[in-house]
Amino acid sequence: MPKDKALKKVMVIGSGPIIIGQAAEFDYAGTQACRALREEGLEVVLINSNPATIMTDANMADRIYIEPLTPEFVAKVISQERPDALLPTLGGQTGLNLAKQVADAGILDQYGVRLLGTPLESIKRAEDREHFKNMCLEIGEPVPESSIISDVDAAVAFARKIGYPVVVRPAYTLGGTGGGVAFSEDELREIAVRGLTMSIIHQVLVEKCVLGWKEIEYEVMRDAAGNCITICSMENIDPMGIHTGDSIVVAPTQTLSDREHQMLRSASLKIIRALGVEGGCNVQFALDPESYDYYVIEVNPRLSRSSALASKATGYPIAKVATKVAVGLTLDEIKNAVTGKTYACFEPALDYVVVKYPRWPFDKFSLANRNLGTQMKSTGEVMAIGRTFEEALLKAVRSLETGVTGMNLPELREWDNDRLRARMARPDDLRLFLVAEALRRGFPVNEIFELTRIDRFFLDKIKNITEAEELVRAARPTDVGTPTGVGAPAGLTPELLRRVKRIGLSDTTIAELVGTTSREVHRLRRELGVEPVYKMVDTCAGEFEATTPYYYSTYEDEDEAEPQAVRKVVVLGSGPIRIGQGIEFDYCSVHSVWALKEQGVKAIIINNNPETVSTDFDTADRLYFEPLVPEDVMNILHKEKPDGVIVQFGGQTAINLARPVEKAGFNILGTSVADIDRAEDRERFDQLVAELGIPRPPGGTGFSVEEAQRIAEQVGFPVLVRPSYVLGGRAMEIVYNSQELLEYMADAVRVTPKHPVLVDKYLLGKELEVDAVCDGETVLVPGIMEHVERAGIHSGDSIAVFPPQTLTPEIKEQLFEYTQQIARALKIRGLVNIQFVLHEGRVFVLEVNPRSSRTVPYLSKVTGIPMVNLATRICLGATLPELGYRGGLYEETRNIAVKAPVFSFAKLLDVDVCLGPEMKSTGEVMGVSKDYALALYKACLSAGYTLPSSGKAVVTIADRDKDEALPLVRSLVNLGFEIVATEGTAAFLRSRAITVEVARKVHEGSPNIVDLIRENRIHLVVNTLTKGKLTTRDGFRIRRAAVEMGVPCLTSLDTARVVIEVMRARQRGETMPLIPLQEYVS
C-alpha cells in the first residue's frame, strides 16, 4: 500500500524536557521521524518545549514551535498551521496524553486533522487500565488479578480481598510516577493518594504483585495491512517489582527455552493485532520461572525507552520505520537503511549480547532512598555490546563513569555476611556488586538466588567474572619485596590475558589485582599482541553486507573494521545522561560530527548512550559503541590512527580524557590540554586572572580542615566551598559559619581525597553567563545570559534570560572585554563558557569552562549562530573572519528567550527541593516572546508550574530574607491570595499590616502546614531555606509535601518575583502570538 496521497503537511509532537522516565530517547525518535517524513516529501510542523534537542533545530522541520506542551498551545499551532495529520506516538507519554486531550476537546475534528499511526481507540485500549484488561481477557491472554480504583478506600478493600503485596499503577503517567508496591495497608494508603493525584484521569490500577517472576519484553512492529514482526526480545536481569527503566536489561533474552520464547512472541503479536497498533509497540510480560505461567503486564502503544534500546541493540531503525508505517507504507515496502538490500519486514538477528545499565543520580543526592521499585529513579542509561554476557556487563559498568571499573566495590569488604544478605534481599543500585562480593566469599549460588530471585544463569555468569579475578590474582608476584608499578608480573601470560579479556576484565581491574598500573598492563598487552578486534552491528548477523555499520570491541580473531586511509577526526561523546551533563552535550557532539562531514572529513564518534542521536546508525561515518574510559578509547585510537581528536563537545567526560589521549601521542584539536588545565586548575587560573587584572571573589585552596578554616576566616563568611574539578556543582555548598564548615569538611571532602577543597568568599549578586567562540585571536560572543536567581544557585538550575533585561551598555561592554581577555590568554580554539557575578556594581569572574556548555543549544537557536559548527571548523584550522564572522558582542534579537530548569523531584522521594550551588535539574525548557513577562509565562508553563490564579499561599521565610520578601507577599495579597504562615513569619507580616492565617509547625501537632498541603488546601508555597538539610526539619517536610501534591514550591525569592510577574501577565489575559523558530532571528 503506497503512501497516502492526501497527506501534505504533518504535525509532530515532541516529548518536552528531560525528566526521570522520559529522556533523550524521544529526541532520537523525533529526529528520525522528522527526517523520515521529509524523505516522503511531506511538510513537517513540530511543537516541542525543549531547546536542547536536535529535533528542534531549524533544519529538522519546516516550521518549529518551541512552545509549552499543553492542549491550549497544541490547539493554537493546529489552528495556525492547519496540518492534515498529527503524529503523536514519537513524543513519549507527553505526546500521547496531548493527542488524547486535543482529540477529546474536539480540536482535531474542528480542523479536520487525523491522527497518524496508532488510532486513538487503540491508544485508549492500551493506556486505560480497564479497557486493556478486558481486551486481554477477550483474546485469552492472562492478566494479574486487578481492580481499577478511583478512591483510596476502594483500593484498601480490594487489597484485603487478594492479599498483600499489591502493585499500584496510575493511568496515563510516565516512569511509574506515583506508583509503587505496597506491603501493608498504611503503605497502600500513602501510594494510592499519590498515584491518584498524579494520574490525569484520577485512576489507578491495583493488582496482584508477582514479585520474583522474570520480566520479559518484546519490541514489535505492525503496519496497516496487518504485517507484524518482533524486532527484539529483552530480559530484565532483575525480577518483577523493579521498573524496567531501573532494571539492568539484556538482549536478546538469555534464559528462556525455545518453547517459552515462542509462547511469549506469539502472545505479543496477538496483542498488537488485537490493539490495532500501527507502528512500534512494546509488550511486557511476567513469566513464572517454575512453570509456563505468564501474565501480560502492560503495553506501550508508542515509542519508548525500550524501543530506543531495541533499536540500538539490533540496528533496526524503529522510529524511522514506525513513521513510514504511519503515513501508509507497509513493512515490505520500506528498505532497511543499514543493509540497503533487505526490507523492514525482516526480523533482525543478533550474534552478540547487549546489556543496558541504568545511571542513577544517587551520587548527587546522597540522602535519597536508593531502594528500587516500580517508580523509576534513573536519569539515563548506558549500553554495551560484547560476545558474552560477562564482557557486555563489565563494559556497561565501565561506561557508567562512577569511578568503578569492575564488579568490585572496595567498601563492601568491610561488611559482614549478615549485612550483605540483608542488602541483597532489597533491590538497590548496588545489587550486582553485592552479589559479586557474596560469590567471592563462597556463598552458594542457590542461597543468592533465594535472596534476590535473579536467575541462576546470571549468577553463574557473575561467578565466572569473580573466578577470572582469582586467576589474575594468582599471577601476582609472591615476594613482597617487588615494588608495584615497576612492571607487569611475568605470570600475566598472553594466554591468561586473552582469557580474562574475553570475559571483559579491564586493564585497571587486572592492574589492581596484580599490584601494577593500568598503563603498564596496557603496554604489556600491546607488546604480547593481546588486542581487541572490532565487530559489526548489521541487523542480520552478517548475512548481508552492511552499508552503515557500527562497531563494538571484543577479544576474538577476526576483525571486521578496516581503517580507511582518509582524513578523519574522532569526536568523543558525553556518555549517559545524568544531572549536570544532559542532552545538551549530545546536541554539541552531533553538530560537530555534521560540521566535519560538511568539510569532507570522515567523522568517527565514540559513545555509549543508546538514547541519543549521536549513536544513531547514520549520524557519523563510523560509530564505536564503547565505554568512554582511557583503555577503550585508546584501543580505538590505536586502531583508527585519526588526524585528531575533539574533546570540547562531550562535557566533562570528554575533557577528562584529553590528557590520557594526548599522553598516548594523539593530537587534541581545539584548545590545548595545557590551556584546559590552566582554566580548570584553581591556582593557575587565579594567577591568570590576577595577571589580567580581572576581579575575582577572594578565596584559596585548603589542603586540610585547618587550612580551610583559616581561609574562611580571612575572607569572611559566608563562603562557597567545593572540591576541585567538579561538574554540576557536586558537593558544593554555601556555609555561613565555622561550625557549618566543619560539618561540610567531615562529609564532603571525602568526595575526592586526592584533591583539596576550594574556599571562596560568597558574593551576593546577579549571575551572568557568557558563551563565546574564539579562534585564538578573534572572539565572538553570541550573547550574554542574565540569571533570574542570584549567584549561589547553580547556573543549570537558574532561569536564564536572553537578551539581558537589566544590564547597562557599560556592563555588557565590560563583560565582553573580560571574556575576550580570558579567551585570548587561554588560547581558546573553539568554545568557552564563562560565569560572572555582578556584585555592588562590579563584575567578578566566577569560573571558566574551556568547552561547550549546557547553554550552547539554547543560545545557538535564539541567535541563529551555528556555534558548534564554527567551533569545529576552528578546530580544523579556520579563523572566524574566514568563516564570515567578525569578533565582538553580537547584535541582540528583538525576541526575548527565557530558559527554565525542569526538576524530577516527584520521582525522588527524600530529596530536598531547595535550590543551591549543587545542581538538581534534569532538563530544560524555553519560552519566547517579544514581551518579557509572556516569555517568562511560557517558560514557567513549559516547566510544568501549574500556577494558581488565587487561593491560599504558605509563606515561611528565613529571618535573613524577611525584609526582602515583604513586597512579594504584598503582591500575592494584591493578586487575591490569602496568606498562611507559621508563628514567626506571621508575627513579622502582621507587624507590617498584612492579614495572615497562622498554621502550626509540624512538631506542634495537627492540623499543621504539611496536613493543609496534603489535604489540597494550599495552592502555592514560598519557602526560603533555614539552615540545616536534615529531613526532619519543618522546611524540608513542607517542600516535599508540596512536590508530592503537585503544589508549586518556590525556594528562591528571585524565582518567586518572576512567578508573581507571570501571574500578573496571566490575569491581564494578554494574547500570546506563536513565533516559529525560523522567524526568531529574521
UniProtKB/Swiss-Prot annotation:
Cofactor binding, per record: Binds 4 Mg(2+) or Mn(2+) ions per subunit.
Annotated positions binding Mn(2+) 1: Q284, E298
Protein name in UniProt: Carbamoyl phosphate synthase large chain
Record InterPro entries: ATP-grasp, CarbamoylP_synth_lsu, CarbamoylP_synth_lsu_oligo, CarbamoylP_synth_lsu_oligo_sf, CbamoylP_synth_lsu-like_ATP-bd, CbamoylP_synth_lsu_CPSase_dom, MGS-like_dom, MGS-like_dom_sf
Chain ranges of the ATP-grasp domain: 133-327, 686-876
Keywords: Amino-acid biosynthesis, Arginine biosynthesis, ATP-binding, Ligase, Magnesium, Manganese, Metal-binding, Nucleotide-binding, Pyrimidine biosynthesis, Repeat
Entry note about domains: The large subunit is composed of 2 ATP-grasp domains that are involved in binding the 2 ATP molecules needed for carbamoyl phosphate synthesis. The N-terminal ATP-grasp domain (referred to as the carboxyphosphate synthetic component) catalyzes the ATP-dependent phosphorylation of hydrogencarbonate to carboxyphosphate and the subsequent nucleophilic attack by ammonia to form a carbamate intermediate.
Annotated Mn(2+) 3 binding sites: Q835, E847
Cofactor names: Mg(2+); Mn(2+)
Region Allosteric domain, residue ranges: 945-1082
Region named Oligomerization domain: 402-561
Subunit note: Composed of two chains; the small (or glutamine) chain promotes the hydrolysis of glutamine to ammonia, which is used by the large (or ammonia) chain to synthesize carbamoyl phosphate. Tetramer of heterodimers (alpha,beta)4.
Family named by the database record: Belongs to the CarB family.
GO molecular function, one term: carbamoyl-phosphate synthase (glutamine-hydrolyzing) activity
Positions with a binding annotation for Mn(2+) 4: E847, N849
GO CC terms of this entry: cytoplasm
Pathway involvement of the protein, from the record: Amino-acid biosynthesis; L-arginine biosynthesis; carbamoyl phosphate from bicarbonate: step 1/1; Pyrimidine metabolism; UMP biosynthesis via de novo pathway; (S)-dihydroorotate from bicarbonate: step 1/3
Region Carbamoyl phosphate synthetic domain, residue ranges: 562-944
Residues annotated for Mg(2+) 4 binding in this entry: E847, N849
Residues binding Mg(2+) 2: E298, N300
Record-level GO BP terms: 'de novo' UMP biosynthetic process; glutamine metabolic process; L-arginine biosynthetic process
Residues holding Mn(2+) 2: E298, N300
Species in which this protein is naturally found: Desulforudis audaxviator (strain MP104C)
